[in-house]
A protein has these predicted regions:
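Beta-rich carbohydrate-recognition and catalytic domains
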Residues: 1-70, 74-170, 175-241
Length: 241
């Protein structure tokens, strides 16, 4: 099973195959419809200026769309179920992450608690679960269901992405190999958008983690990757052509 999302999707997409090499097929109904997600099921009205989420001030508009996105899926072997972190829209226009569970990978039951910012990517290291989120901030918890505590500033990732950095991460991904945590991410404002990589050696004190200098791992080369499109700085929101 491969779970993915449309930026303005009304449900989580699912592709399936008998082999990683394919052929892959789309499960057309999708899973976890926005109407069942516990997030706003329809586009809410614009809130008063003093109630807008702080990040929305950087957008020209159009951020108030009901959606579910950014699935991060983990197999719970002992519980024989699938755990999926996902985010959606609150009535005040902010976006947050929840977790949902499924016994078959098709029907998911969302949990009520809000766990943190959008774009959760979670790994387990020793006794802790660590999550990176939009803007590169790290959180941690003892349990998959939270609660997650936010790392105090300037944490190791925020030293990469703080006010003095030209990098503004958009979509993160984590890969843990032994004690080495690999962080992959794209950046808002890139022209064109690229995939960066950096890594750090983990220890028990997450405030002592130090990431290497990010380097560009992938840039658009093929037409289907967007290499033939006009070079324009990326912005927050959906991509249009």
């Amino acid at each position: 099973y491969l779970y993915f999302a449309h930026h303005k999707g009304a449900f989580i997409r699912l592709a399936y195959a008998d082999d990683l090499k394919g052929p892959w097929h789309i499960y057309s109904p999708g899973v976890l419809d926005v109407s069942e997600s516990l997030f706003a099921p329809t586009d809410p009205p614009e809130p008063p200026p003093d109630q807008r989420p702080s990040w929305a001030d950087t957008l020209p508009g159009g951020y108030l769309y009901a959606h579910v996105a950014s699935p991060d899926v983990h197999i719970d072997e002992s519980g024989k179920r699938i755990r999926m972190y996902y985010h959606g829209l609150l009535d005040d226009g902010d976006q947050k992450t929840r977790v949902a569970y499924s016994q078959d990978g098709l029907s998911f039951v969302p949990q009520t608690p809000l766990l943190g910012p959008p774009y959760f990517r979670v790994i387990r290291y020793k006794e802790w679960l660590y999550a990176t989120t939009w803007q590169g901030r790290f959180l941690r918890a003892r349990d998959w269901d939270g609660p997650f505590e936010v790392q105090r500033d300037p944490g190791p990732a925020m030293r990469l992405f703080g006010p003095d950095s030209p990098l503004e991460p958009r979509h993160p991904a984590l890969w843990l190999k032994g004690d080495t945590l690999h962080l992959f991410f794209s950046c808002v404002g890139d022209c064109p958008e690229q995939i960066y990589h950096c890594q750090c050696e983990l220890g028990d004190d997450w405030d002592s983690w130090v990431f290497t200098k990010p380097r560009i791992l992938l840039s658009p080369e093929k037409g289907w990757e967007g290499s033939d499109l006009p070079h324009k700085a990326s912005v927050l929101g959906t991509a249009t052509s």
